[in-house]
Regions:
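Short aromatic-glycine-(Arg/Gly/Cys) micro-motifs in beta-strand/loop hairpins
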Residues: 4-14
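Acidic, low-complexity, intrinsically disordered interaction modules
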Residues: 38-113
Length: 133
């Protein structure tokens, strides 16, 4: 089956927006792109969804269909809640799909650090981040 990449929701400013990107094959890619594509120096940082290459906005109904059914073509599902300082990640890291929750600011710090393995860095700091799976 073709990998469709990841589906993600960005909550902030009282709204939610939904996206997919075939170039994001997992949370590690998502984190890396947050830093790599933040924008040009001296300008305001790009919005999160514009940092993700080939991000395509989808409707809430499409998001719900993908996320609720855990569409097997997608390698991960990510929800970024900026106001609540949360990043929810549902990804198969080797033992089936599992749900994780990290502080948004910690994810951004790891992105800025250029950590080779964001999972390792975040799980070392937040060992209870795994919520299920």
């Amino acid at each position: 089956m073709k990998n469709k990449g990841c589906a993600f929701e960005i909550q902030g400013g009282g709204t939610s927006r939904y996206f997919t990107s075939p170039l994001v094959h997992g949370f590690a890619d998502f984190v890396r792109f947050l830093d790599e594509n933040q924008g040009e120096a001296g300008h305001a940082p790009l919005p999160l969804h514009k940092r993700i290459p080939q991000a395509t906005q989808i409707s809430e109904a499409e998001w719900r269909n993908i996320a609720d059914n855990q569409d097997t073509g997608y390698s991960c599902f990510i929800v970024v809640n900026i106001a609540e300082n949360q990043v929810w990640v549902n990804e198969d890291t080797g033992a089936g799909m599992a749900l994780y929750c990290f502080p948004f600011l910690a994810v951004m710090e790891v992105a800025a650090s250029g950590a080779a393995d964001p999972w390792e860095t975040l799980l070392a700091k937040y060992p209870s981040a795994k919520m299920s799976g």
